[in-house]
């Protein structure tokens, strides 16, 4: 008999642990053999010896201690259970569908019924050699049983799994999700049919995208323009140094828009929480929203960082898809693009621009870069992502500026010109309600509470700068590098073509509505179109915000604020009819449904962009006037 056989025979059998009594586990090797990492052998032919050979030779006690690590018990020497149905039956209540299990039916009963049904049409061996029989091995199944298995599974799936939800119930769930989520406001624009085509003589979107020529770069030479290196956007985004395609930019913008949307959700949650806390308080007149200064700074920095990344993407798009060279450059004024919508966005982001001279002549067309197709819907998505990202940034900055406006209004309660009966309940300056917004210029920072309005003004100027650059870069991407906005072509209206005159006069700058003079230096600013006009009329002191958006009208004079506050909910705009100058024509060709749908969404997004820019401009002018007057 070999030592291994004698070891197996002489090893004391451990009793099987039961739920009632669990035996203490011991090592199979004694302590001395375990410490020496040697095999623990019993004397051959002796079955009652509890000491191993080494302990007998050393004349020491053979001690077996419990194992220090309790692992999974070995299954080789233990007999397998004869059947497993009790374990399966114990788990059946957890997986039984309550809507399908009638009259006490279970999964096992359904399988038995399906097998009985299959036995009537299949070979007799298929029932005995079912793939779900535990006693049979998968290798021993016959071909008939293998062929029968899919039928059994299909029968089970058709009889057990629940049917899809009804269409009405699904619609209710989608509506509930849409109402609770803080997604893009243009999400509900999809599905609206029959967008009207723009006329051939109209510049697409020119009456909605009003603003300056791109301020990003100063181009001195055509050859240097093609040598602008592509730099990485962010470590989390595309970081390759090679030339990017439209797909790469779409991926960058999708990731960037997800970050901006997350900022929007957190900002909206912070405002709702502050409004709830303010509603539970005494509601004293002049009390600001209890938003900590640290949270405000965090959200401001996040959105400024997202704006920087947006500018980076637009810079790379405009640098890569810009025309490399042209024999002649057309005049810097409005021009007409191909109105066919399946070519619109491809023309905007590629080199294939058509410059209108005198309304009839066409300028020189540059060659389309490799890999750019005029009918590629990827360019429609690219334009859509750029505009909706800019729209969400407008939402976020509008909320941040409204917080600044709210704090300045509450700071006005400490002004000596304010009536005493309105400020008698106002305590001293509180850092939690009127904190100093630590704005620093190099090594200099403001430390006086009297400079609070100036600090807020610097924040507004910084937001204005980044949004203006994003808008001008977006115009450069959509309408070409030589696009001159209608607001800046009023001086040459007499010499421009009919189409140019129409596009220049379609939508006047907001300054004309209030009587302020149009200043050339501020024509490109989103916020301050007539910031240098100091003749404040009664209409300049009260800026009414667009109705239905939750904005409270604000009075520059020191009067008690209205009871309603900035809720910053983003309701979907009602049916917005775009200007007739854009949608007043019918094109001869019908665009693809996908591109036509994107065009309709973009038009509605542009209308909401214009509304938000007006709200931001009114708030910024209020803060600017406070900064100039002081308090």
Swiss-Prot record:
Q: Which of UniProt's keywords are assigned here?
A: DNA-binding, Metal-binding, Nucleus, Transcription, Transcription regulation, Zinc
Localization annotation: Nucleus
> What Pfam families does the record tag this protein with?
Zn_clus
For the region Disordered, what residue ranges are annotated? Answer: 1-28, 64-141, 489-522, 536-573
Does the keyword Aminoacyl-tRNA synthetase feature in the UniProt annotation? no
- Give the annotated DNA-binding region, as residue ranges: 30-62
Disulfide bridge partners, by residue number: none
A Gene Ontology annotation in the biological process aspect, one of them, is: positive regulation of transcription by RNA polymerase II
Gene Ontology CC terms, in alphabetical order: nucleus
Q: Which Gene3D superfamilies match?
A: Zn(2)-C6 fungal-type DNA-binding domain (4.10.240.10)
Q: Do the record's keywords include Zinc?
A: yes
Q: What's its job?
A: Transcription factor that positively regulates the expression of the cluster that mediates the biosynthesis of acurin A, a highly reduced polyketide coupled to a serine via a peptide bond.
Q: What is this protein called?
A: Acurin A biosynthesis cluster transcription regulator
The molecular function terms of the Gene Ontology recorded here are: DNA-binding transcription factor activity, RNA polymerase II-specific; sequence-specific DNA binding; zinc ion binding
Gene name as annotated: acrR
Where the protein is mainly located, per its record?
nucleus
- Give coiled-coil spans as residue ranges: none
Gene ablation phenotype (knockout): Abolishes the production of acurin A.
CDD domains assigned: GAL4 (cd00067)
Q: Where is the composition biased (Polar residues)?
A: 1-11, 119-128
**Biased segments, Basic and acidic residues type:** 88-99
């Amino acid at each position: 008999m070999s030592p291994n056989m004698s070891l197996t025979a002489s090893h004391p059998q451990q009793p099987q642990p039961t739920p009632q009594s669990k035996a203490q586990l011991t090592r199979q090797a004694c302590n001395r053999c375990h410490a020496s990492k040697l095999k623990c052998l019993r004397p051959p032919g002796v079955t009652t010896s509890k000491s191993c050979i080494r302990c007998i030779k050393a004349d020491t006690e053979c001690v077996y201690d419990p194992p220090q690590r309790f692992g999974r018990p070995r299954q080789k020497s233990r007999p397998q259970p004869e059947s497993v149905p009790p374990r399966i039956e114990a788990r059946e209540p957890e997986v039984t569908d309550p809507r399908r299990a009638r009259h006490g039916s279970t999964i096992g009963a359904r399988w038995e019924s399906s097998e009985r049904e299959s036995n009537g049409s299949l070979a007799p061996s298929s029932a005995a050699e079912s793939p779900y029989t535990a006693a049979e091995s998968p290798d021993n199944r016959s071909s008939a049983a293998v062929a029968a298995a899919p039928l059994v599974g299909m029968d089970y799936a058709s009889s057990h799994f629940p049917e899809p939800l009804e269409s009405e119930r699904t619609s209710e769930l989608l509506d509930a999700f849409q109402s609770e989520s803080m997604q893009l406001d243009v999400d509900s624009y999809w599905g609206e049919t029959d967008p009207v085509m723009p006329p051939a003589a109209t510049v697409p979107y020119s009456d909605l995208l009003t603003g300056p020529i791109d301020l990003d770069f100063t181009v001195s030479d055509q050859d240097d323009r093609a040598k602008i290196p592509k730099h990485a956007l962010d470590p989390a985004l595309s970081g390759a140094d090679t030339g990017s395609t439209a797909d790469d930019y779409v991926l960058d913008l999708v990731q960037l828009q997800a970050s901006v949307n997350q900022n929007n959700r957190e900002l909206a949650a912070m405002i709702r929480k502050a409004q709830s806390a303010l509603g539970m308080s005494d509601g004293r007149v002049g009390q600001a929203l209890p938003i900590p200064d640290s949270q405000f700074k965090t959200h401001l920095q996040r959105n400024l960082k997202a704006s920087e990344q947006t500018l980076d993407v637009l810079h790379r798009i405009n640098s890569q898809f810009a025309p490399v060279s042209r024999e002649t450059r057309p005049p810097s004024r409005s021009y007409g693009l191909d109105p066919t919508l399946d070519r619109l966005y491809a023309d905007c982001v590629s080199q294939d621009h058509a410059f209108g001279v005198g309304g009839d002549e066409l300028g020189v067309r540059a060659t389309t870069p490799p890999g750019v197709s005029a009918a590629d819907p990827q360019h429609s998505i690219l334009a859509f992502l750029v505009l909706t990202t800019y729209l969400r940034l407008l939402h976020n900055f509008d909320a941040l500026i409204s917080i600044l406006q709210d704090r300045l209004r509450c700071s006005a309660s400490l002004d000596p010109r304010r009536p005493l009966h309105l400020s008698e309940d106002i305590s001293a300056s509180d850092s939690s309600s009127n904190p100093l917004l630590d704005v620093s210029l190099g090594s200099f920072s403001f430390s006086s509470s009297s400079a609070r309005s100036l600090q807020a003004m610097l924040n507004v100027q910084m937001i204005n700068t980044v949004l203006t650059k994003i808008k001008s870069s977006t115009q450069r991407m959509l309408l070409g590098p030589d696009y001159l906005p209608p607001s800046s072509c009023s001086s040459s209206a007499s010499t421009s073509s009919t189409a140019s005159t129409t596009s220049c006069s379609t939508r006047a700058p907001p300054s004309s509505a209030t009587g302020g003079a149009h200043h050339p230096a501020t024509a490109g600013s989103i916020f301050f179109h007539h910031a240098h006009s100091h003749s404040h009329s009664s209409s300049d002191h009260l800026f009414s915000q667009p109705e239905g958006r939750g904005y409270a009208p604000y009075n520059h004079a020191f009067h008690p604020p209205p009871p309603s506050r900035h809720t910053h909910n983003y309701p979907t705009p009602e049916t917005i009819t775009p200007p007739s100058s854009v949608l007043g024509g019918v094109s001869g060709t019908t665009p693809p449904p996908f591109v036509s749908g994107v065009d309709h969404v973009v038009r509605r997004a542009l209308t909401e962009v214009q509304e938000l820019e007006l709200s931001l401009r009114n708030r910024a002018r209020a803060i600017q006037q406070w900064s100039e007057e002081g308090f």
